[in-house]
UniProtKB/Swiss-Prot annotation:
Disulfide bonds: none annotated. Its EC number is 4.2.1.136, 5.1.99.6. In the N-terminal section; belongs to the NnrE/AIBP family. In the C-terminal section; belongs to the NnrD/CARKD family. The keyword NAD applies. GO terms for biological process: metabolite repair; nicotinamide nucleotide metabolic process. Residues 9-201 form the YjeF N-terminal domain. Residues 348-354 are annotated as: NADPHX 2. Keywords: ATP-binding, Isomerase, Lyase, Metal-binding, Multifunctional enzyme, NAD, NADP, Nucleotide-binding, Potassium. GO terms for molecular function: ADP-dependent NAD(P)H-hydrate dehydratase activity; ATP binding; metal ion binding; NAD(P)HX epimerase activity. This is Bifunctional NAD(P)H-hydrate repair enzyme Nnr.
């Protein structure tokens, strides 16, 4: 049995909408799948559907329509809140299905369908769901859970109280928690709802929507503190990476560059906090100063704009020993990352060959103990086991500096997310920002234009 985490399933659901496979169609296929599994086991009978406020309830409403020959009742534990659930409930009402608000006095059905919370549940159940779970478990009805039993954590398999299903009908792939809590899942049926296998391996707006985090009760620094270490022969690269991190959501970005170019880098924007480290180049003698800066930041981005500096790689290798998270680009890319550091490497083909030779990219990621985001017309992202491909972007992005922007975006996401998901989200967002630029300027835009397009690209991702 193949598995997919609840997060990756939600990402895939959003990406399907972007690729033209609507959530409405997926819900239709899911609800029909539930009905099919019921009708494999029963020819007739009374069915009571317990529906929550989200799309799990929507799946239940669709199932009601497909249960031909059954006496179906729908109980709303909460009013539907999603557009799809509202629409499918309205169809049920128009079709004449009895719809009642709240819990029944008793369960007198042959079959109960749990379409209450699905994969959205975490922690202790609130009312009326807690009472509903008790009622369902105490009944003699055949119990069918939609996607996962209500109360069960879909990933960890943990629960305090959960529907003890005789049958769980899940979609696309099983959720990991189903294998860890067989005592409440019963038989597990995995239904194909029409998602092409290739979609699971493509980056899209769903990746961005889940990696970009904004907390209503946050204070400065909560959304991430990034340290950019680079510069030397080039001044624009560290500035672009720093600005990209800010535009992608990081609260604080410090740019550490050689003293010789500090004023030039600072002149790019009043939003930059620029620290001079070393004189003409960043060298091993500056390590202690850099290590103090590392302690005050969540993520280190290193390598852009360094140019010819034989000591820089050694500086990076030492910094990684005290660093929890890092994004390494250009001259900062190393072939092995210590276990204490969660790391994204962002080479283009030439840089990849320089560091890893002709090693296949998945094997290189395993060897490096890092996520590799291999830049190209189609970006490849892998941690050695998982692989995703990004197809956003256009030929205008061959202009210099777009890779620096990508590194900054990846760092912003990595502040509050894991390396693989951050890299996937960064690759798509960077390309989408390029597509936003193309709509405005054609192919003739710069990396500065790309940075300024990041907020609009984020809004587009969140609209799906």
């Amino acid at each position: 049995m193949e598995f997919i985490s609840s997060r990756d399933m939600q990402i895939l659901d959003t990406n399907c909408e972007y690729f033209g496979l609507s959530r409405m169609l997926l819900m239709e296929n899911a609800g029909k799948g539930v009905a099919e599994e019921v009708m494999k086991r029963f020819y007739e009978g009374k069915v009571q559907i317990f529906a929550g406020s989200g799309n799990n309830g929507g799946d239940g409403f669709v199932a009601a329509r497909h249960l031909k020959g059954f006496d179906v009742e729908i109980f709303l534990l909460s009013k539907p809140k999603t557009e799809l659930a509202i629409k499918n409930l309205e169809i049920c009402r128009k079709a004449g299905f009895p719809v009642k608000e709240g819990l029944p006095e008793e369960i007198d059905a042959d079959i109960v369908i749990d379409a209450m919370l699905g994969t959205g549940v975490r922690g202790r159940l609130r009312e009326p769901y807690s009472t509903a779970v008790k009622m369902i478990n105490e009944s003699d009805a055949f119990k069918v859970a939609v996607d996962v039993p209500t109360g069960l954590d879909p990933d960890s398999g943990s629960y305090e109280e959960a529907v003890k299903a005789d049958l769980t009908v899940t979609f696309h792939k099983a959720k990991p928690g189903l294998a860890k809590a067989r005592e409440v899942c019963g038989e597990v049926a995995v239904k194909d709802i029409g998602i092409p296998e290739s979609f699971e391996n493509l980056c899209g707006p769903g990746d961005v929507a889940f990696s970009y985090k904004r907390y209503e009760d946050a204070h400065k620094g909560v959304h991430g503190k990034v340290l950019v270490v680079g510069g030397g022969d080039y001044t624009g690269a560290p500035a672009l990476a720093s600005l990209a991190a800010l535009y992608a959501g990081a609260d604080i970005v410090t740019t550490a560059v050689p003293m010789a170019i500090r004023k030039v880098v600072a002149s790019f924007s009043p939003n930059l906090i620029v620290r001079g480290v070393g004189e003409e180049r960043i060298e091993m003698k500056n390590l202690e100063e850099l290590e103090e800066l590392v302690k005050r930041h969540d993520v280190v981005v290193a390598g852009m704009g360094v140019g010819e500096n034989p000591e820089f790689k050694e500086v990076v290798e030492e910094l990684l020993k005290s660093c929890k998270k890092a994004v390494l680009d250009a001259q900062g890319i190393v072939d092995s990352v210590p276990e204490n550091c969660e790391c994204i490497l962002t080479p283009h083909r030439g840089e990849f060959g320089r560091v890893f030779g002709d090693t296949e990219v998945q094997k290189a990621a395993l060897k490096a103990k890092a996520v590799i985001l291999l830049k190209g017309r189609e970006d490849v992202i892998t941690d050695g086991s998982r692989v995703k491909v990004n197809r956003s972007g256009n030929a205008g992005m061959t202009v210099g500096g777009t890779g620096d922007v990508l590194a900054g975006i990846a760092a912003a996401f990595l502040c509050n997310d894991d390396a693989f998901h951050s890299a996937c989200a960064a690759a798509f967002l960077n390309g989408l920002a390029g597509d936003v630029c193309f709509e405005k300027f054609g192919y003739n835009y710069t990396a500065t234009d790309l940075v300024k397009a990041i907020p609009e690209a984020i809004l587009r991702c969140k609209s799906f």
